């Protein structure tokens, strides 16, 4: 029997009912008000699905391009895939925004379940898509997301933004770059 003050009583669909229960459980466990939990996590319609994160692997010789975040760590250019963009379009857009480069998105290196490769674990699921790209123009320009861009060899990697990409993920990108018959890896 549900308590009369539970918001579950008015849930319109099974998805809404599950979302309400989840919000109440997370509220109880975290100490956050239920409305705050809903504001953060319950704004989607239907079943919750993973967010998509794209990362561009751009090479010059035997070096890979990384961008320096405002917190001084480094990552492959990339970010959340916008709802109105394909993975390919978004990867190209993110590289332009973060590294100032015009690129072509040439092949998918890997599709990974973020939880299996990156920390910390998020409260929502994320699929990471690594895309090998080629530069066709442009140059780094000052922006609000990144401080600089630079190419690094595998043995001289700087401190990484490991919530975005790990050394193992960058090694995987190098392996794909060096292989003519790379097959997309996926979890």
Protein language model features and the residues they cover:
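Acidic/histidine-enriched, glycine/proline-rich intrinsically disordered or flexible terminal extensions
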Residues: 173-187
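Acidic, metal-coordinating catalytic segment for phosphate/diphosphate chemistry
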Residues: 13-55
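Residues that form generic nucleotide/phosphate-binding pockets
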Residues: 25, 40, 169-176
